[in-house]
Amino acid sequence: LPSDATPVLDVTGKELDSRLSYRIISTFWGALGGDVYLGKSPNSDAPCANGIFRYNSDVGPSGTPVRFIGSSSHFGQGIFENELLNIQFAISTSKLCVSYTIWKVGDYDASLGTMLLETGGTIGQADSSWFKIVKSSQLGYNLLYCPVTSSSDDQFCSKVGVVHQNGKRRLALVNENPLDVLFQEV
């Protein structure tokens, strides 16, 4: 990480800590709000919940807590903007479902015209599981999917946003309107 690395902050202004769990919450309230949660993917034959969704409103259930696992763990416990990282749902689970907690980008969904976020990723490997947190041009932060392991400035990253799937808001790769989020310690 460069010496001018900027730490990611939670809603109270504290730096994110890889040892703690956070809810990914919306920067908006009411019908535009809603926390991120782990749920069952439509038409999935996976034995465990494997879809990454956002509730339809901020009134109601809280989201599923996550941990951020930075690729630069030798820099301490902080999580920094533009750092390659893995995202893992921080939940108790059966042995069968352990691999269904780590975020990744799934295959292209032709009916929705995009790639959906799901679980089943691998921590620390150069597959479909690398993400970044960047400052939003609006309020809060955006999540990016960054499939290349290099941290060069010309790295190709895609924005994470929301698409509608069977009446639910599913996290997916988008060209416009990335999801603006904040992080709330659990």
UniProtKB/Swiss-Prot annotation:
Q: In which tissues is it expressed?
A: Tubers.
Protein name as annotated = Serine protease inhibitor 2
Signal peptide position in this chain?
none
Function per UniProt: Potent inhibitor of serine proteases (chymotrypsin and trypsin). Inhibits tightly human leukocyte elastase (HLE). Does not inhibit papain, pepsin nor cathepsin D (cysteine and aspartic proteases). Protects the plant by inhibiting proteases of invading organisms, decreasing both hyphal growth and zoospores germination of Phytophthora infestans.
Instruction: Report the locations given in the UniProt record.
Output: Vacuole
PTM per Swiss-Prot/TrEMBL = Probably synthesized as a single-chain precursor which is cleaved to form chain A and chain B.
Subunit relationships: Heterodimer of chains A and B; disulfide-linked. Double-headed inhibitor able to form triple complexes with target proteases, by binding simultaneously one molecule of trypsin and one molecule of chymotrypsin.
Q: Which UniProt keywords apply?
A: Disulfide bond, Protease inhibitor, Serine protease inhibitor, Vacuole
Which InterPro entries does the entry mention?
A: Kunitz_inhibitor_STI-like_sf, Prot_inh_Kunz-lg
Q: Where is this site: Reactive bond for chymotrypsin or HLE?
A: 115-116
Q: Where do the TM regions start and end? A: none
Miscellaneous section? The serine protease inhibitor PSPI-21 comprises two protein species with pI 5.2 and 6.3, denoted as PSPI-21-5.2 and PSPI-21-6.3. They may be encoded by two alleles at the same gene locus.
Assigned protein family? Belongs to the protease inhibitor I3 (leguminous Kunitz-type inhibitor) family.
Which residue pairs form cystines in this protein?
A: 48-97, 146-157
Q: Which GO terms describe its molecular function?
A: serine-type endopeptidase inhibitor activity
Q: What induces it?
A: By infection with Phytophthora infestans.
Q: Which GO terms describe its cellular component?
A: vacuole
- PROSITE patterns the record matches: SOYBEAN_KUNITZ (PS00283)
The source's superkingdom equals Eukaryota
Q: Where is this site: Reactive bond for trypsin?
A: 67-68
